[in-house]
Amino acid sequence: MHEIDLSKYNIRSDLIIENNFKKYLQESYTENNIQVDYVKLNKNNILNKTEGDYITISFEDITDKTNFSNVLSILNKELKRILKLTNIKPDDKVLIIGLGNNKSTPDSLGYEVLKNIIVTRHLFILDKVEGYRNISVLEPNVFGNTGIESQDIIMGVVKETKPDFIIAIDSLAAFSIDRMQRTIQITNTGISPGSGIGNNRGEISKNILKIPVIAIGVPTVVSSIVIVNDTLKFLTKKISYHKKNHQKDKLVINSTLNYLNEKDDLSKEEKKYLLGIIGTLDEITLKDLIYEVLNPIGYNLIVTTKEIDYLVEKFGKLISEALNISLNDL
């Protein structure tokens, strides 16, 4: 039998919430159906993640006025928390960086955020502005468009303008379908652009720039690996749900029922009967196996939702408004 070496496939998520984070969970609360999890990682953590603070905000929707307002309130509060955890003072100068590619909608979150940021650095050159922080912005774009690494551009700007800290905004890759456009991650560990889709560029962190780097990210894409894996998971949950609710006795199965929140699932034996040996694999092993199938033939596509144009614009407004409030005395 052909043995597959899975050790070389490091299928990963940009989100701390999709890793085995429970051991490091410091605080968790729910407000207006919005879940907030605060994780603090030490230097030698088993997740192989950078030491620091991670805040995850999970929600169902931001497209209507009420949900937008509720998420904005939480985001503003958690941004203030991360500023405090990072020891940022009220008069510290900030450079806000919009990472990504403005020609690719799923990767244009940083660009959308910068559109509505209140920029004040040019005013501070003349005199101090009461009630506002010294804020400048930068859109370095991507290596393929500029021929210059984002890290190099940022290092040059930091050297010349001397901000006290950086806030970087970027689109992320999720490890599950239900995280797409339903999660905001805030961390003071910096960021490695493109790492979630295997396109590692130079990291943007305190280690490199010598000043604190706060990163804000929203998952806007998943890979084909995730879609195939989640589809198999949804299949077993749907069969389990209909089995439990005796749908087999009905002439027509109601296809509109939402079974995702059901805790019951098929047993390991039932999964093996349905899917063969594939049904016995744990989630990580299954994703690694799907990677070996799709990646060599170039079919490990990066996928987003059909409403991405509208959602990226909404997230851009949400994050920029929260930053304007939390950074300034408004």
What is each stretch, according to the model?
Residues M1-E51:
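N-terminal amphipathic/basic leader segments beginning at the initiator methionine
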Residues N42-K89:
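An N-terminal, well-structured beta->alpha segment
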Residues L109-F143:
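Anionic-ligand anchoring segments at beta-strand to alpha-helix junctions in alpha/beta enzyme folds, i.e.
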Residues L138-E139, A168-N328:
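A structural signal for small-residue-enriched, beta-sheet-centric alpha/beta enzyme cores
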